[in-house]
C-alpha cells in the first residue's frame, strides 16, 4: 500500500482520503472520502469555518453526503444542525446522542445507529464502538472501503480491550494524545478539572496513547495522527517524542492534528 499527500484534484484511484480539519477543545471535524462518498466526522467549528477549511484543501462542501457524530459535546457538534440544513445532509448518531444534541437542531434528516452494529454510508462501512468518556453515548469508529481501514478514537479516559480490538489492523489511526501528566498536574487548571481529565471518563495522556499505539502497531500501519492535544497541558513535540517511542516494529508517518488549521489530505491507495 502506498500513502501519498496531495491535493484531491491531483490524486486518482485512491481508496480513502482523510483530512483533519480541526482537533482540540475548541472544535473538532474530520473529512473522510472514498471519492463518490464524502462525510464529516463531527462538526465542532462554525459552519462557515468548516467550509473555509474544506475549500482551503480543495475539498467542496457541496460534495458532502453525511455527518457522523461521535458524541454531543459542543466542540464536536457546534454546526451539525446548520450544515445539515444548509447542505441537506443526513446526520448519523445514536439515539442517546440525539436526545442530547437536539439543541443544535433541527437536522435535515436523522439516521440512528447503536455501537457494536456496523452500517454503511453508500460504500463506506462504518463500525461504531463505545468509548469511556463523560458523555451520553461516546463513540469511536472504524471506516473501511476497498480493504483499507481508518480507526478513530478521541475523547476517552482509558483504553479498554474493546477499543484495542476495534482499532487493530488499521492502515491509518487518529488517536487521542491529550495531555502530559506533569504539565497537567503543575498547570493552571482547577483541581476538579484536573481530576476529570485524568479520570477513566476523561482524556488519554501521552503515556496512555503510547501504550495503545505500541499494542496496535503492525507492518501495514502507514499513518498515525495524534489528536485532541491540549494547548495548555501538552505540546506537539512532546507528544511526538513520547509516541514515537512506541513504534518499534513499524515506521508509519506520525503527525499532530492542529486546532488552528486543517491538515494535509492523506490518501490511502
Where is each model-derived feature located?
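Active-site metal-binding loops of divalent metal-dependent hydrolases
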Residues: 22-23, 43-45, 72, 131-134, ...
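Conserved beta-strand hairpin/beta-sheet module of binuclear metal-dependent hydrolase folds
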Residues: 1-57, 139-154, 172
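Metallo-beta-lactamase
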Residues: 2-5, 94-147
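Active-site metal-binding motif and surrounding structural segment of the metallo-beta-lactamase
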Residues: 47-93
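Active-site environment of divalent metal-dependent phosphoester hydrolases
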Residues: 74-77, 98-100, 135-136, 159-161, ...
Amino acid at each position: 500500500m502506498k500513502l501519498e499527500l496531495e491535493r484531491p484534484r491531483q490524486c486518482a484511484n485512491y481508496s480513502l482520503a482523510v483530512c483533519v480539519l480541526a482537533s482540540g477543545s475548541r472544535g473538532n471535524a474530520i473529512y473522510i472520502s472514498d471519492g463518490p462518498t464524502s462525510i464529516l466526522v463531527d462538526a465542532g467549528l462554525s459552519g462557515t469555518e468548516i467550509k473555509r477549511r474544506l475549500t482551503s484543501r480543495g475539498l467542496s462542501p457541496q460534495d458532502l453526503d453525511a455527518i457522523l457524530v461521535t458524541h454531543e459535546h459542543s466542540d464536536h457538534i457546534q454546526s451539525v444542525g446548520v450544515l445539515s440544513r444548509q447542505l441537506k445532509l443526513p446526520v448519523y448518531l445514536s439515539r442517546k446522542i440525539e436526545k442530547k444534541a437536539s439543541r443544535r437542531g433541527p437536522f435535515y434528516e436523522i439516521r440512528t445507529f447503536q455501537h457494536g452494529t456496523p452500517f454503511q454510508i453508500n460504500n463506506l462501512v462504518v463500525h461504531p464502538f463505545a468509548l469511556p468518556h463523560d458523555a451520553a453515548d461516546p463513540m469511536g469508529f472504524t471506516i473501511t472501503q476497498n480493504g483499507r481501514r481508518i480507526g478513530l478514537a478521541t475523547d476517552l479516559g482509558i483504553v479498554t480491550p474493546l477499543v484495542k480490538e476495534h482499532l487493530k489492523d488499521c492502515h491509518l489511526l487518529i488517536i487521542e494524545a491529550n495531555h502530559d501528566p506533569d504539565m497537567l498536574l503543575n498547570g493552571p487548571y482547577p483541581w476538579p478539572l484536573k481530576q476529570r481529565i485524568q479520570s477513566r471518563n476523561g482524556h488519554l495522556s501521552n503515556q496512555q496513547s503510547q501504550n495503545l499505539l505500541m499494542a496496535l502497531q503492525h507492518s501495514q500501519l502507514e499513518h498515525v495522527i495524534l489528536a485532541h492535544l491540549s494547548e495548555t497541558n501538552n505540546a506537539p513535540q512532546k507528544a511526538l517524542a513520547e509516541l514515537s517511542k512506541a513504534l518499534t516494529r513499524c515506521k508509519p508517518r506520525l503527525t499532530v492534528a492542529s486546532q488552528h488549521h486543517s491538515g494535509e489530505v492523506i490518501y490511502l491507495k
